[in-house]
Amino acid sequence: MPQLDVDKTIEELRLGEKIDLVSGIDFWHTASVPRLNIPSLRMSDGPNGVRGTRFFNGVPAACFPCATALGATWDTELLHKVGHLMGEEAIAKGAHVILGPTINTQRSPLGGRGFESFAEDGVLAGHLAGYCSKGIQEKGVAACLKHFVCNDQEHERLAVDSIVTDRATREIYLLPFQIAMRICKTATVMTAYNKINGTHVSENKKYITDILRKEWGWDGLVMSDWFGTYSCTSESIIAGLDIEMPGKTRWRGDALAHAVSSNKVHEFVLDERVRNVLNLVNYVEPLGIPENAEEKVLNRPEDQALLRRAAAESIVLLKNEDNILPFNKEKSIAVIGPNAKIAAYCGGGSASLDAYYTITPFEGVSAQSKGEVHFAQGSYSYKDLPLIGHLLKTDDGKTGFKFRVYDEPASSSNRELLHELHLVSSQGFLMDYRHPKIKSYLYYVDMEGYFTPEESGVYDFGVVVVGTGKLLVDDEVVVDNTKNQRLGSAFFGNGTVEEKGSKELMAGQKYKITFQFGTAPTSDIDTRGVVIFGPGGFRFGAARRQTQEELISKAVEVASKADQVVVFAGLTSEWETEGYDRPDMDLPPGSDELISKILEVKPNAAIVIQSGTPVTMPWAPKAKALLQAWFGGNECGNGIADVLYGNVNPSGKLPLTFPVRLQDNPSYLNFRSERGRVLYGEDIYVGYRYYEKAQLPPLFPFGHGLSYTTFTREKLELNTSPEKDKLQDGEPITARVTVTNTGKVAGAETVQLWVVPPPTEVNRPVRELKGFAKVHLEPGESKDVEIVVEKKLATSWWDEKREAWASEKGVYWVQVTGTGEGVLTAEFEVKKTRFWTGL
């Protein structure tokens, strides 16, 4: 299809067609105008993989490590390659736009979507997002930076008013967007759900038009977050929101037609919104993706290798006393813990997807160990009972269960079977499930499979629904979640609290499991303040009841007999998810006790934590070997095993500060919405800026990470260009330092460049990260590393009186740090205070 002549097309469009173009037609597609050859475009989540068009029963995809994991690599070259693969995955899914990267700032360790963003620091987050976006767009696919801006919590996210100073907005929350845009001007940007200082961002001219378009010179398409449009006329259209997502429209359509006819919205303003839609069509047109393209899979060996590399390079070696790691492959090993035999490969919400495959830590370790491998559960990490679908069999012997859709409930004697599927996962979000015979969101589903337990005992069963549900064992109701329902956190905050029941089962006996589900309209639960996604969703699980004491006792016994021990603990997509902020930083119940007991009998045990954001570690002082392994994507288990056994030398550095306790974090008194507002009381002191200013030592600082080798840094040279009368864009500060691998194994070092400001008119952080570079070195090898930063970006703070950046005169110190102790310093001078705006 040829490129559109945008001006001519706008002239030829009828008013109704223009209005159609500025809102989606369904969950993932824009409108088409066939008579003018304007195609429909497809969008897809998301930040750590391209899901395609279906949450429910979708086509599998590559799952990348979560953003904080990628942030821990501090590797722009790797993120560039990740972006390339994301672009190729999008093309395979027939998607023109990837809804990512996410670059909100983790002002609290509790944010439900904290794992979706790269770092607490705008320089690190912005560079990684920029290179990831560049990789995506070099494949012809449009990237989408989100959520613009201050969408930093899930609590009351549609309504909360973020009260934040302009200085903090500029220096902390807008900075990653600004830096990413300097590297790659993404084709699209998504607005945040929240308000800033009284106005929703999706109708906030200051941010969409004045800053993004005028000051930064960006000319792409602005879309709303899903159901994040709150107005029709002057508020969103005039503010610069180009397209409302998803469809069908709530705020445009007939309401917008009336607004144009009454001059509430001038047609030339609508034309500007349409222009940006058509420009996006032209941007992705060379892809040649047909409308309603078939969704395909890639899963190539080279893709698997990249995912494995990313998983391994993201792992942060927090402690390694007595050089306990790497382990010896010839020795026996005990693999213990709640995360050992599950693949905690991604967080929850719009970042979740059905991966091509997953590798658990136990599988990864077992594949590499040449000695005996033993396992003990130790404790469980589930929030709700673990899914049971993969343990069921159909009546014809297939793994999974039958999913039968009816027009009437099970109590009806003459109901019609509308559709039948075979499923394996006992969790389903039906918002994008469609079938020609299903005419509304009201229908009923019977799910049926057979369970044969391996062990006798009391089994607990649990049901979570957006709708209503009953679980039956051999036709006996064990769980009834149809009455007196309580709203919980699952399914973006739409789901009920898990209702439970129990039944004693005998090993080897086959039991029929039936789950009767009614969609969302069958429930009378109060869902004010949350968005209901169509027909709702379901989740049912089960587990044999065991006491924590029994589990730990068995784990201690197994650990005591092995040469080497590794404990896998942490969180999962149940604990870290969109729609829900964590109430605390704690590991799931039982995990801390398990780790402490194992360390008592095996002080040399290695502890591996999987989480997207910080957790408390009361046992950390006793642990000699400790790794942070994040949510590692498809290859999480292999990546962890590669580091444990020394196939890969760990090179990750923390992109987040890990506080000793929740009360230490700077947002502790001001997180969550109170009376519809959240006060960003810590101002610019987010993350390390606060801990260093307050002289409050964290458990592990931002930028920390050890290696199996050692490095030296020396010969710091600092060069600056002669100052002009006017501070020039691109005027550089170039730092050169020699890095040497002084150890016995190859490794990678991240050189971090910090700038310490002189005394200035305003209170400033002790120092701020301004640049970084990663270098790979063989044993004994030296390389000169060069980091170039612009002087104006290295020295400026936001002056609210002048509404401009201020590069204040004075002597600034550069600090260069990396693995281990030692700081190299140098200085440069800014001789004249200057003010500037722009990108």
Swiss-Prot record:
Name its pathway: Glycan metabolism; cellulose degradation
- The broad enzyme category this protein falls into is hydrolase
This protein is called Probable beta-glucosidase I
Which parts of the sequence belong to the PA14 domain?
Answer: 396-556
Keywords from UniProt, A to Z, are:
Carbohydrate metabolism, Cellulose degradation, Glycoprotein, Glycosidase, Hydrolase, Polysaccharide degradation, Secreted
The gene name reads: bglI
Keyword Chaperone in annotation: no
Q: A Gene Ontology MF term for this entry?
A: beta-glucosidase activity
PANTHER family from the entry? Answer: BETA-GLUCOSIDASE (PTHR42715), BETA-GLUCOSIDASE-RELATED (PTHR42715:SF27)
Its EC number(s) = 3.2.1.21
The protein's matches in InterPro entries, at most eight in alphabetical order, are given as: Cellulose_deg_GH3, Fn3-like, Glyco_hydro_3_AS, Glyco_hydro_3_C, Glyco_hydro_3_C_sf, Glyco_hydro_3_N, Glyco_hydro_3_N_sf, Glycoside_hydrolase_SF
Which family, according to the similarity comment?
Belongs to the glycosyl hydrolase 3 family.
State the compartments where it is located. Answer: Secreted
Gene Ontology cellular-component terms listed: extracellular region
Q: Name one GO biological process term.
A: cellulose catabolic process
The active site lies at D225
> Which function does this protein serve?
Beta-glucosidases are one of a number of cellulolytic enzymes, and catalyze the last step releasing glucose from the inhibitory cellobiose.
Source species taxonomy: Eukaryota, Fungi, Dikarya, Ascomycota, Pezizomycotina
The organism named in the record is Emericella nidulans (strain FGSC A4 / ATCC 38163 / CBS 112.46 / NRRL 194 / M139)
- Glycan-modified residues: N197, N494
Please give the start and end residues of each transmembrane region: none
* Catalytic reaction(s) noted: Hydrolysis of terminal, non-reducing beta-D-glucosyl residues with release of beta-D-glucose
